[in-house]
A protein has these predicted regions:
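Intracellular juxtamembrane helix-capping segments at the cytosolic ends
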Residues: 39, 120-134, 141-142, 349-362
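Hydrophobic core of transmembrane alpha-helices in multi-pass small-molecule transporters
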Residues: 104-121, 335-349
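C-terminal ends and interior cores of transmembrane alpha-helices
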Residues: 86-100, 317-330
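C-terminal transmembrane helical hairpin of 12-TM major facilitator-type secondary transporters
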Residues: 246-255, 279-357
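Glycine-rich segments within core transmembrane alpha-helices of 12-TM secondary carriers
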Residues: 137-158, 372-386
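Symmetry-related core transmembrane helices of the 12-TM Major Facilitator Superfamily/SLC fold
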Residues: 175-195, 408-427
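Helix-to-loop junctions at the C-terminal end of transmembrane segments
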Residues: 64-77, 294-307, 393
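Extracytoplasmic gate region of multi-pass secondary transporters
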Residues: 32-37, 157, 231-299, 385-389
Length: 460
């Protein structure tokens, strides 16, 4: 199943909505923290255990993106979106069965494994297509689509909280909420499957598109078109520097995002104005809004100031934000909330900017497959971030600590990880020409046509 080629006159601005319909759906993953307290209560789980479906989903996201990236390039975005629809929706249906029967392993398998595969394939499905449609503004194009993944929880978080209030927070209410999620997302994601189009070869190879594709990245010198294969990219230090950059940025962001609802309640549990469950769900929605805004805002900014400079901002200022939370967050809700919002905007911006960073370094030839392989950094971060925050919080609670003290050590670790990412970003340099593929030769028919045209004046 391949996506139909766009007819003449097809507007490229119809493609981002197709990507958004998929990314807004799979972005529900960022609202998992809303389900954590009910699951812990209904199934007698610890905070570390209730994070397992989310952690495994992120692991499977990276693995399926890495191993499926080349197939997505070959089979096209419509095939990928269909696979994502089936897996993601089926994951919720299996989780509903697991909750109804009080079998936590089935929730882990359904949401974490099956749903995680849908996350990975769905996440990368529109990326290379968008870059081909928008060679002149790759940061903007991928930001428009990928912001949907960050904004998915903006819808899913209050929606899930409302369903749990209506259905109840016992295992049957959780099962009903999972069931509604699965059926609703199946319908919504089908819109993307029906709408997606790939650019016509003539349009992709037009002089304007070719010139835009060869345009240098902001701050870079003009040069020949870069073409690096996915296999060749793995042999470059640039790929692994970006792997570290993405892993550190995601670990720092996902740690706070996965535990956002219980974290803000713990931080201010002993204050004169504790945070209610509904207010905590609203905080998760705010974080999702910042995540979404960062994906479009910061990725568009990278088209102006350059990818390396914008990652300096993400990692350097991000480390400062974590430090402020550690030092002053427990004493001030505004400081805690503002710093968390800035961090999540950087977290989202990092995801949306990375495809354009890859395009600048490796070209568009196999950027989708390269992006898929890089997302193994997300898999690693999906384990590290929640594990660091949840395990240390459980350990501190067992030691008799409460409030902000539960998170001081883990958030300090996040500060250090962002510094490591900052150093890795500084090490990124242009890819050495020895890794470049030869420029494609013009088809014989085109060459013959050019020869014929050049000879016409002589025969006249």
């Amino acid at each position: 199943m391949s996506a139909p080629v766009a007819p003449p006159g097809w507007s490229r601005w119809l493609v981002p909505p197709a990507a958004l319909s998929v990314h807004l759906s799979i972005g529900q993953a960022y609202a998992w923290s809303v389900f954590k307290p009910p699951l812990e209560s209904a199934l007698d789980l610890s905070g570390t255990q209730s994070a397992l479906p989310f952690q495994l989903a992120i692991v499977m996201l990276g693995l399926s993106a890495a191993f499926g990236g080349t197939m997505v390039e070959r089979r096209g975005p419509r095939w990928a979106m269909t696979v994502a629809l089936v897996c993601f929706s089926s994951g919720f249906l299996l989780s509903a069965l697991g909750a109804a029967t009080q079998q936590f392993w089935l929730i882990v398998f359904g949401y974490g494994v099956v749903g995680g595969i849908g996350l990975g394939i769905g996440y990368i499905s529109p990326v290379s297509t968008l870059i081909k449609w928008f060679p002149d503004r790759p940061g903007l194009a991928t930001g428009i689509a990928i912001m949907g993944f960050g904004g998915g929880a903006l819808i899913a978080s209050p929606w899930s909280a409302r369903m749990l209030e209506s259905f109840g927070e016992d295992h049957t209410g959780i099962a009903a909420a999972f069931l509604v999620h699965g059926l609703t997302y199946a319908v919504f994601m089908s819109l993307g499957v029906l709408l997606i189009r790939v650019p016509r070869p003539a349009a992709a190879g037009s002089p304007a598109a070719t010139a835009a594709a060869k345009a240098p990245a902001p701050g870079a010198a003009p040069g020949p078109e870069i073409r690096v294969s996915a296999r060749g990219a793995l042999r470059t230090p640039q790929f692994w520097c970006l792997w570290v950059v993405l892993c550190m940025n995601v670990t720092a962001g996902i740690g706070i995002l996965e535990k956002a609802a219980p974290m803000i309640r713990d931080f201010f549990a002993g204050s004169s104005a504790p945070v209610s469950a509904s207010a905590a769900a609203g905080f998760v929605a705010l974080l999702s809004a910042a995540n979404m805004a960062g994906r479009i805002g910061w990725s568009s900014t990278s088209d102006l100031i350059g990818r390396k400079n914008v990652y300096r901002l993400y990692l350097g200022v991000g480390a400062l934000m974590y430090l402020l939370i550690v030092l002053f967050g427990g004493a001030s809700k505004p400081v805690f909330v503002v710093c968390a919002l800035v961090l999540l905007s950087f977290y989202g911006g990092g995801f949306a900017t990375i495809p354009a960073y890859l395009k600048d370094l490796f070209g568009t030839h196999q950027v989708g497959a390269i992006h898929g392989r890089l997302l193994t950094a997300w898999s690693t971060a999906g384990v590290l971030g929640p594990l660091i925050v949840n395990w240390l919080a459980d350990r501190e609670a067992a030691a008799g600590k409460d409030g902000p003290e539960l998170y001081v050590l883990s958030l300090s670790i996040m500060t250090g990880l962002l510094v490591v990412g900052f150093i890795a970003n500084e090490l990124v340099r242009p890819v050495h020409p020895r890794h470049h593929l030869p420029a494609p030769t013009a088809p014989k028919e085109a060459a013959h046509g050019a020869d014929t045209r050049s000879q016409q004046p002589e025969s006249a």
